[in-house]
Amino acid sequence: MSRKASLSGFHEWLPAERLVEQHVLDTLRRTFELHGFAGIETRAVETLGQLLRKGEVDKEVYAVSRLAEDEEVAAGRREPKDPADPKRLALHFDLTVPFARYVVENAGHLAFPFRRYQMQKVWRGERPQEGRAREFTQADIDVVGDGALSPRYDADVALVMAEALGALPIGDFLIRVNNRKLAEGFYRGIGLEDTAGVLRSIDKLEKVGPEEVARLLQEEVGASPEQAAQALALADIRTSDTSFVERVRALGVTHELLEEGLTELADVVATLHRRAPGRAVADLSIARGLDYYTGTVYETVLVGHEQLGSICSGGRYDALASKGNRVFPGVGLSIGVTRLVMRMLSQQMAVASRSVPTAVYVALTADEDWSEAQDVAALLRERGIPAEVAVSAEKFGRQIKYADRRGIPFVWFMGRDDAGARVHEVKDIRSGEQHAADPADWTPPAEDLLPQVARAQD
């Protein structure tokens, strides 16, 4: 991870690093499918109008154009396109907005509630830094309903993510949960109608601190010092159980939307507290910057690595996807896979047992044995044992060094006994043990069959 990318913000993994990423993706996929989520993939490009319908991300979007089109504009043969043309194509910056479009276009072919997972590259024109890249992989789960969606799914998706993250070698993590209705109802209850502006300011709390947020609330939202103090008092509430309800009510603010949000959040937190103890807290400072969230919102941090920011976030959206009078409310969470893997590698949180899939290297001492060596490898592969064959005869020592350099645990030798009959032996180059083996039935230990990714020893 100390290598410098030739193109800033676009990471390329070495084989051992890629194995760690693949382990993360495989673990997530397996967990998602155990919970009944179906995998899909959407196109890499959307129209600019589709991407910018919700949220303030226009400066982060990569627009797409044909090189020939740019040349025609430069030559004066056609007018340049309006940069803000809603029909212009651009790379998607997340998977939620494309998924909303996918649901609308395919609603007649989907069974609702529709449970989907999606793992793809996304692109954002951000300033590259630790934990932030311009091209990165996300892994999303969402449940979408037709017309309505039970609030129980808000807890369901969080439990799935808690299980998925708990299966990874990343140590402790914490899912921080809030509710937009609770926050917006509170702000309106204290007389602040620009709830979106308040949320944007509160969303900066961990980066700039309470004094700066108080200033932003007063200068940009028009809050009085007392209103700013009340908004910050709400954001200061954090509990591991439903006791946050009493603490909010103790602030003396009333509003119908506030009560609705309190009830929804209490139900989610109670379920998480019961089924995933120690994995989640109610944290009323969580705002989430995107405008399409309408209820429960989540952010997840690695304990001890909070400065990395959220590795998994999302929430409830009731109006992101619609078709005429038909509305498709949903709730989902997204893991920043690249961000997570970058931290796993840089902090040596997990390591791959080897950098290649090969378990057995079939050595050659005579070039005329190459075809027979291929037969040995074929027998091994038929039983699911990854094997490769030397392309030319060399001294055993050189071939063992080659296997060791690549991390291949076993070397297969073909020889002949005193009577000239073919004999086979396999050597564990880590321990030096060598014994007779039959290519038709020999199997390596289960832990050596494929590369293993495990939490590094402290």
UniProtKB/Swiss-Prot annotation:
Reaction(s) catalysed by this chain's protein: tRNA(His) + L-histidine + ATP = L-histidyl-tRNA(His) + AMP + diphosphate + H(+)
Keywords, in A-Z order: Aminoacyl-tRNA synthetase, ATP-binding, Cytoplasm, Ligase, Nucleotide-binding, Protein biosynthesis
SUPFAM superfamilies reported for this sequence: Class II aaRS ABD-related, Class II aaRS and biotin synthetases
UniProt subcellular location: Cytoplasm
UniProt GO MF annotations: ATP binding; histidine-tRNA ligase activity
Any single Gene Ontology cellular-component annotation: cytoplasm
One Gene Ontology biological process: histidyl-tRNA aminoacylation
EC number: 6.1.1.21
Leading EC class: ligase
Any Pfam family hit: tRNA-synt_His
Subunit record text: Homodimer.
Family: Belongs to the class-II aminoacyl-tRNA synthetase family.
Protein's recorded name: Histidine--tRNA ligase
Source organism of this protein record: Micrococcus luteus (strain ATCC 4698 / DSM 20030 / JCM 1464 / CCM 169 / CCUG 5858 / IAM 1056 / NBRC 3333 / NCIMB 9278 / NCTC 2665 / VKM Ac-2230) (Micrococcus lysodeikticus)
